[in-house]
């Protein structure tokens, strides 16, 4: 940091000297122009923008909490925490709208990077025009940052060069620095000054690289251009006895060489690969075409375009993904998933059970680290017809005293996606179901019955704080905030309670259907209470606990009872539901 400070001070001194040497008249002209520009800019902001963007927020932050933080600095017209449209979970940012520009400016000065709920927030002016938001003329990119440098430290470093609109260090999923960041200056000239002063300097002992930010589409375009006109090639499978002279001579026949080098270890021994840089692209392309696969000193050479590390990683990732998809396609429809296995069932017994239905290529019971059965496994047949026959006949069949669950095995991501879609569909029809429940309760003569808050797909157990996806939005007409359906004696304006516009029954059910319905609800409520206790003991997030309970409770009651009695089966189902819930949240955040 001291190196940067010294250079910055030196730069400022040089600027002052240059200003003193200029004639007074020429100095005054740009000053007037600058002041007019600044006044125009400020006037524009004052007239059009008293709204702040507040980012990096803790998921539990509410509008009320933000009001307590921001209201002391000036009158606020509105606050909105941006939330997922389905789950109502916070997206981690909000908008605070002041009634005047000065209050917003003061908030940025005093609260930017201040901790809210233990997490430093990031504040900047909200820009409604997408064209201006995407304009990157004053945006710079910094890499090789020390892990200790955060948003505030980066802002303090670069604010000496001019007004900073926003500043951000990229973080991974665990909140750790990824070693690079961005600083957006109001003026492009300030960005250029910062690049000139800081690029190559030391920050916390690390030499940083600073340059103008290049949009992704431009980077990809330049990369494709570089690929098409490469001059640097990579060579491997080189005999370790090969000398530098032999290596250069092998490639010099194709054109003029800028450099040719064999990579060596600390002891000076060749590593078996090297690089050759040609002057002309055509020479490099010809060398790749003629020498790739050719034997040199009894070894087949690999010769190809030299790639950057991230390119190689991306290529390997694509190869792995292609291999994975090919493997999945190969086993599509032939691999069965079997659960509710007795602990006595091992691989051989599992294979024996399914052998009558066709040729089995593999059968495996999944086990934990201690070798104990997890209660589920997989059987792979040689054809989809055999697998379908086995699934049809073995599903719900009693084996070792337990009914088997047999289904076609699905990939985790497919299962999670299906669960997420089911959650969305249930959520959309939940309000209609709630109305029907209220109508049935009213028809059954149950005045003042408490309608519990809803889980993702079901009613929450009584006495537990299950989340209600609609609580953060406006209440429906005639629905009291406390979730109670008031008793009939309160509808007539009696003084013993507040008046509500009641919701009349929409359907009249026969008495025996009402009793059956009520019995079902009692059973679901009892199971929900027990499930919620087990789920909430494994996860601290009440919102997630409620939704996971709802997903599990959507299973048939008999299966839910089995889960409550069997901890291993419960653990498996819990992990699947948790993974589906997390995947659903990520998908919604990506769409937003």
From Swiss-Prot:
GO CC terms of this entry: cytoplasm; nucleus
Residues covered by region (Disordered): 1-43
Biased composition (Polar residues): 11-20
Keyword list, A-Z: Cytoplasm, mRNA processing, mRNA transport, Nucleus, Repeat, RNA-binding, Translation regulation, Transport
Main location class: cytoplasm
Biased composition (Basic and acidic residues): 1-10
Function: Binds the poly(A) tail of mRNA. Appears to be an important mediator of the multiple roles of the poly(A) tail in mRNA biogenesis, stability and translation. In the nucleus, involved in both mRNA cleavage and polyadenylation. Is also required for efficient mRNA export to the cytoplasm. Acts in concert with a poly(A)-specific nuclease (PAN) to affect poly(A) tail shortening, which may occur concomitantly with either nucleocytoplasmic mRNA transport or translational initiation.
Name this protein carries in UniProt: Polyadenylate-binding protein, cytoplasmic and nuclear
Organism of this sequence: Kluyveromyces lactis (strain ATCC 8585 / CBS 2359 / DSM 70799 / NBRC 1267 / NRRL Y-1140 / WM37)
Gene encoding the protein: PAB1
